Amino acid sequence: DVMFSNIMVGRDITKSISMDLGNFSSSYSLLIGIPQGVASAMSASMLPSVVASFTDRDYDSIYDKITKTLKTNMFIAVPSFVGLFIIGQPIIKLLFSRYNSVQGGMMLKIGAIAVVFYTLSTVTSTALQGIDRVNVPMIHSSISLAVHVVLVFVLLKFSALGIYAVVIGNATFPILIFILNLRTLYQEIDYTMPYISVFAKPGISALVMGVFTWLSYKGMYTLTSSNVLALVIAFMVALITYFGPYYALTKMRVFE
């Protein structure tokens, strides 16, 4: 925020700084932070059992617990990402009417993927703590922070992205942490994440959900011109079109 303010002041566009930062801090960060909070809670519950399995040198149990926690978190994070990407703008228009919903919606289109990677980085950081590598996540976060600062500075200084540069930095920050965490888990306990079983079911289900959610919102808004009513219908459609395909794929056991 300080970097953004200083560079934007240098460009003599101070009028929009407060509104841009308010939109980022309130609408974007708050909506992104809700599923992240769920991930933190689930990861915390995983820690004691991973510690117990590591004490017994039961690596198969550790693999199973990490993978199950990743699957559970992706069950929430992936549709959250798709939902914020698809109908982020009308959600902001409803909840944060004082801010520019078009700008906020674009922030979510650019940065909603952070929901997935913050979740992945949180789970893998907890797993590293569970195998007695407590300081490693902090080191990885420091490395990612250094890259983050350089990236945001370059984007702010040499592009016209403005607040979107901060969003890009926020979205890319957890990606490097996750990559470094996963690499260390492989080195320490030979853990390899089963990408297909972790991402396939929520990914396919969320894509189906996204299409029907967008169509239902657009259709209802065209008919009624009511953002609230269109969102209510869209949320109902989202629930049905996500859980339906997910349940079907689970019963088929295609990606197990």
Question: What is each residue range found by the language model?
Answer:
Residues S197-V254:
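Transmembrane alpha-helical segments of multi-pass transport proteins
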Residues F81-R98, F153, F158, M220:
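Short membrane-interface helical motifs at transmembrane helix boundaries
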Residues N135, L145-L182, M193, L215-M236:
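Membrane-interface helix-loop junctions in multi-pass transport and translocation proteins
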Residues I113-I143:
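Membrane-interface junctions at transmembrane-helix termini in multi-pass inner-membrane proteins
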Residues D1-P48, A52, M209, T213, ...:
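Transmembrane helical elements of multi-pass membrane transporters/channels
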Residues D20, T67, F85-V115, S225:
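Interfacial segments at transmembrane-helix termini and the short loops linking adjacent helices
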Residues G37-L70, S125-A127:
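Helix-loop junctions and terminal segments of transmembrane helices
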Residues K65-I86, I163-E188, G203:
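Short alpha-helical transmembrane segments in multi-pass integral membrane proteins
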